[in-house]
């Protein structure tokens, strides 16, 4: 029984590390590109945003992973087709990340128009790339040898 508890704790630790790594890397790269090229923010504003976002991403990575896994379990209950997973990934990403992203931009001093432009752009791009993050997260979980959400019991 004790080894099961240790394995479970180790699995949770690996899951947390994988989720954190994926969140920090993905959000830094994608959001910096959005902020500079689509939202008209300066490099310095975007860099400030990303520096504020890293500790935030570290804090929200595990809750997001749990939130996303919930969406995945619900999608699996509906059916086990690939498009259902894609939609669940998109919905989880957009509904969780958009309010967090808006708050980060507000904290670094972006004006209302920049916030709306960045969050709106991020939402549109997330509809195309939200599933990409899901696949990236799954990849990171495999790298960290985490039991994938498909293998977990609901």
UniProtKB/Swiss-Prot annotation:
Disulfide bonds: none
GO cellular component terms, A-Z: plasma membrane
Keywords: Amino-acid transport, Cell inner membrane, Cell membrane, Membrane, Transmembrane, Transmembrane helix, Transport
Pfam families tied to this protein: AlaE (PF06610)
Record GO terms (molecular function): L-amino acid efflux transmembrane transporter activity
Transmembrane stretches, start-end: 21-41, 51-71, 90-110, 115-135
BP terms from Gene Ontology: amino acid export across plasma membrane
Membrane topology: Multi-pass membrane protein
Subcellular location: Cell inner membrane
Similarity annotation: Belongs to the AlaE exporter family.
Its biological purpose: Exports L-alanine.
Protein name, entry field: L-alanine exporter AlaE
Gene transcribed to yield this protein: alaE
């Amino acid at each position: 029984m004790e080894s099961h508890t240790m394995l479970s704790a180790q699995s949770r630790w690996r899951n947390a590390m994988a989720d954190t790594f994926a969140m920090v890397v993905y959000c830094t790269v994608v959001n910096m590109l959005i902020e500079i090229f689509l939202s008209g923010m300066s490099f310095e504003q975007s860099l400030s945003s990303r520096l504020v976002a890293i500790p935030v991403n570290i804090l929200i990575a595990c809750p997001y992973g749990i939130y996303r896994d919930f969406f995945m379990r619900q999608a699996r209950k509906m059916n086990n087709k690939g498009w259902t997973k894609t939609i669940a990934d998109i919905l989880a990403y957009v509904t969780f990340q958009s309010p967090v992203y808006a708050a980060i931009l507000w904290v670094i001093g972006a004006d209302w128009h920049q916030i709306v432009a960045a969050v709106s752009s991020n939402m549109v791009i997330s509809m195309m790339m939200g599933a990409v993050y899901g696949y990236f997260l799954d990849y990171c979980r495999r790298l960290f040898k985490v039991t994938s959400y498909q293998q977990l019991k609901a």
